[in-house]
């Protein structure tokens, strides 16, 4: 039997498999156009979510590429959710309607990890989120009606909406003043 022919054949097969793998990985980056308006986006997750380990990374996030899950163009991907950070400003009600028009809601920031992720990408701007004060109950609720158990700073009698961004906290704000907004929806 001619062993060098078999080894040469195996090397060719391995090179073809490696070449095909690289082609499939980088082809979407070369031709980033799509007919449905979706594109691959950055993905953030804890180390344990990505690698199955129990120890988080030092900053709590690790950047990966997500090829199986997509968000619309200009939306950010995090933990199977898509987030849109607007550059325009409007009142809380207009912001809620804007998000609804995009098939989403104002962001429900109900975990410390989600808050950190959003604060890391909001820069030095204030953004409305889906948190509103119910005077009759004297408590804050998310727009999905779940109870907010955290603290809101800068509370004032006329401040019934909440923002995040400038500080590392939830800040009460007037619902009538114009701020940017964060919309949230499921990734596809």
From Swiss-Prot:
One Gene Ontology cellular component annotation held by this UniProt entry: tertiary granule membrane
Topological region Extracellular: 28-188
Pfam family, one: Lectin_C
Residue spans, topological domain Cytoplasmic: 1-4
Known glycosylation sites: 32, 93, 144, 151
Gene Ontology MF annotations: carbohydrate binding; virus receptor activity
Protein name, per record: C-type lectin domain family 5 member A
Organism: Homo sapiens (Human)
Species classification: Eukaryota, Metazoa, Chordata, Craniata, Vertebrata
Gene name in the database record: CLEC5A
């Amino acid at each position: 039997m001619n062993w060098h022919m078999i080894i040469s054949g195996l090397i060719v097969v391995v090179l073809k498999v490696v070449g095909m793998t690289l082609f499939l990985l980088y082809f979407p980056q070369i031709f980033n156009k799509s007919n449905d308006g979706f594109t691959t986006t950055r993905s953030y997750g804890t180390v344990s979510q990505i690698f199955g380990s129990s120890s988080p990374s030092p900053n709590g996030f690790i950047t990966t590429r997500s090829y199986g899950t997509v968000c619309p163009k200009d939306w950010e991907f995090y933990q199977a959710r898509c987030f849109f950070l607007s550059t325009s400003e409007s009142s809380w009600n207009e912001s809620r309607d804007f998000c609804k028009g995009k098939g989403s809601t104002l962001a429900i920031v109900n975990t410390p990890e989600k808050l950190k992720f959003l604060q890391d990408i909001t820069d030095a701007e204030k953004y409305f989120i889906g948190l509103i004060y119910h005077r009759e109950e004297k408590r804050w609720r998310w727009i999905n009606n779940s109870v907010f158990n955290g603290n809101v700073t800068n509370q004032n009698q006329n401040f019934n909406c909440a923002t995040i961004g400038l500080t590392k906290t939830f800040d009460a704000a007037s619902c009538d003043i114009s701020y940017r907004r964060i919309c949230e929806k499921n990734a596809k």
